[in-house]
UniProtKB/Swiss-Prot annotation:
Location of the protein in the cell: Cytoplasm; Cytoplasm, Cytoskeleton, Spindle; Cytoplasm, Cytoskeleton, Spindle pole
Ranges annotated as biased composition (Polar residues): 329-342, 511-520
Native source species: Danio rerio (Zebrafish)
The name this protein goes by in its record: Protein FAM83D
Pfam families: SACK1
Main location: cytoplasm
Gene this protein is translated from: fam83d
Compositional bias per record (Basic and acidic residues), positions renumbered to this chain: 350-362
């Protein structure tokens, strides 16, 4: 970790400060706090009634009243309709307003793991300079604020740190992606909590997964939190907007990183450089230490982690129900097929008749595959993958009935079935009913689950991936064969027999280059001629 990441190195950290000669009534107003409690607990009418009773002017605008009402978080045990009047409001209730955040916390702050400029405390960063940009501009560039921000991002070499309440501009985000992927510049973004949903929606529209951008770290921050005696709290928003570049340049102002500020709204941007950037450096590290990671349920998913192609292969019980059980147990409607249109097929009706008449002979048509014929429909394709089939005799030696938990292959539903060591063949044979039917019928009822996997699509995806893998290997092998054949042709050309006239001319040339031969032989050594031609 760079030395500049430690807040203890900041100037004035943990040093006694002089008492300010400011009026405490201007910093804290008890009547305002009580009025806010009435607003959160009783609504706007209760708030106005309290102001009228205390003869206070309304210190909140209508827009602020709506924002405070929406931002207020009331504990679940406290009613927002004023049913908590029985609680003691004299201050004896243990509430959050009397707590404090310790100066030294036991929670480890997040680390700037991708790196940070190694500026030591009080190091000289240059003369403070400022350049102002206004938009719309009447000079050479109309959108001067946006162009200035993009130019600073393109010229960044060490780090890009952004604090903003809006990040939905596609051009700005494209420049940030290019900086962290191509130039390997660390990018840190602190977003206001209310704008996270818009940012994630933009990433989803661009098919961008934040987990794949290793050099970009996005976290959320909030404003100050106002606690009340009832346990309710009001959390403010972040209105800070600045971008720190390489630790010695800062862009700040009213400009926001969205399309409306880039094209429609009037805004300003101030580019600062020099020693003044040390204050922004410290402020960003403080905000980063207070930030939180993106919510797990709203984070942009990673394609590798959330791929459902192989989900049906995970945590599956060994073994599948044999074909004998399909004829001896009553089939469930949800387990018959993966398509609802096949609920009443002739095969299924025939199976139901066999169950109703236990004294009848077994069905002469036997399933030769343990997967069942329900799997044939979703696997019908141009080149379907071949599944292993089992063909065995129907002679029964021993019967071992064990209740196990298995998985239905055709519908991917888990149930409890009885594994019976019975082998059947395709030839029609008569068999007498035995105690096996009674033992199988005593198994627990089958609990069907909804189907969520399409086998045909899964196998097609696997086939495409294999073809792509094999084609890449084949192209590499062809390239290697081409290189080897080319080298062999060069070796054959050097070993061709020459006519006597050409042979004498070649000897004369070799004698003329006799001084260079010693040098070449010293360099080449004992290498073969084919290696020398390379």
């Amino acid at each position: 970790m760079a030395l500049s990441q430690c807040l203890e190195d900041s100037p004035g950290w943990r040093t006694p400060r002089k008492e300010q000669d400011s009026n405490l009534n201007e910093l804290y107003n008890e009547r305002h706090r009580l009025a806010l409690e009435e607003l959160v607990a009783g609504g706007v009418q209760s708030f106005m009634g309290f102001l009228k009773k205390e003869r206070m002017p309304n210190f909140l605008s209508e827009d602020e009243i709506r924002r405070v009402s929406r931002a207020a978080v009331v504990p679940k045990t406290i009613s927002i309709n004023g049913d908590d009047s029985h609680l003691d409001q004299s201050g004896t209730l243990d509430c959050s307003s009397v707590t404090y955040f310790p100066e030294v916390s036991d929670i480890e702050p997040p680390v700037l793991e991708n790196g940070w400029p190694a500026f030591t405390t009080g190091s000289y960063r240059g003369v403070t300079r400022a350049v102002a940009y206004f938009q719309p501009s009447y000079g050479e560039c109309i959108y001067s604020c946006k162009e200035a921000a993009r130019r600073m991002i393109r010229n960044a070499k060490e780090v890009i740190a952004i604090v903003t309440d809006s990040m939905t501009d596609l051009d700005i985000f494209h420049d940030l992606r290019e900086a962290c992927t191509r130039r390997r510049v660390p990018v840190y973004i602190l977003l206001d909590q209310s704008s996270v949903a818009s940012f994630l929606q933009m990433c989803k529209n661009l098919c961008v997964h934040l987990d794949e951008l290793l050099q970009m770290k996005v976290r959320t921050i909030t404003g100050s939190t106002y606690y009340m005696r009832s346990g309710a709290r009001i959390t403010g928003k972040v209105h800070e907007r600045f971008m720190l570049i390489d630790g010695n340049k800062v862009a700040t102002g009213s400009y926001r990183f969205n399309w409306t500020d880039g094209k429609l709204n009037s805004s300003n941007l101030i580019e600062l450089s020099g020693q003044i950037t040390e204050k922004f450096d410290e402020e960003f590290r403080i905000l980063y230490a207070q930030s939180l990671p993106l919510p797990v349920n709203t984070r942009a998913p990673s394609s590798a982690r959330n791929c459902s192609l192989y989900d049906h292969l995970v945590l599956k019980a060994p073994g599948t129900p044999p074909s004998y059980l399909a004829r001896t147990t009553k089939p469930q409607a949800e387990r018959l097929t993966s398509t609802p249109a096949r609920l009443q097929t002739p095969e299924i009706q025939r199976m139901n008749k066999d169950i109703e008449e236990p004294d009848r002979k077994s069905n002469p048509v036997s399933d030769s595959s343990t997967l069942g014929e329900d799997l044939e429909l979703p696997l019908a394709s141009a080149d379907p993958p071949r599944l292993p089939s089992t063909t065995v005799n129907s002679q029964t030696q021993t019967v071992d009935v064990t209740i196990v938990s298995c998985c239905d292959v055709s519908t991917q539903t888990t149930c409890h079935t009885a594994d019976v060591s019975v082998q059947t063949c395709k030839e029609p044979q008569n068999s007498k009913p035995s105690s096996e039917h009674q033992e199988v019928d005593s198994c627990p009822p089958i609990c069907p689950l909804p189907q969520d996997v399409n086998f045909r699509e899964c196998f097609l995806k696997i086939t495409k991936e294999r073809q792509h893998h094999y084609s890449s290997i084949r192209s590499k092998l062809d390239h290697m064969v081409t290189l080897l054949s080319h080298k062999r042709e060069l070796v054959d050309l050097t070993n061709l027999p020459l006519r006597p006239g050409l042979n004498r001319g070649r000897k004369a040339q070799q004698e003329a280059r006799q001084p260079n031969t010693n040098i070449d032989s010293g360099i080449m050594g004992t290498w073969p001629k084919s290696r020398g031609l390379q």
